[in-house]
Amino acid sequence: YRDDMRHSRSFFRIYVEFDEMSVLKPLYTTVESFGLQVLDTILNNPRNTGNYNAILSIKNPEDRAHEQVAEYLKKIQGVRKVKLIY
């Protein structure tokens, strides 16, 4: 069980709501500026409304500050909502 616990802390997920697809690039750039890597993105565009949301799975080798990353993502133009998923 100990290995499973260690593995689960090696990545985290962030839910993001945003206005348009062009916001994805600055999201990735911001995550990477923390020395982290986006492993996976689950993207939704509910009913083609232009209200996009994504769940980013982020590799977190040194257990960095999730909250700090989330705060920076909130500052990106076009981002409406950011939520950490534990």
What are these regions (language model features)?
Residues 37-43, 70, 74-86:
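Conserved short beta-strand edge segments in small beta-sheet-based binding/regulatory domains
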Residues 44-49:
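A short beta-turn/loop motif at secondary-structure boundaries
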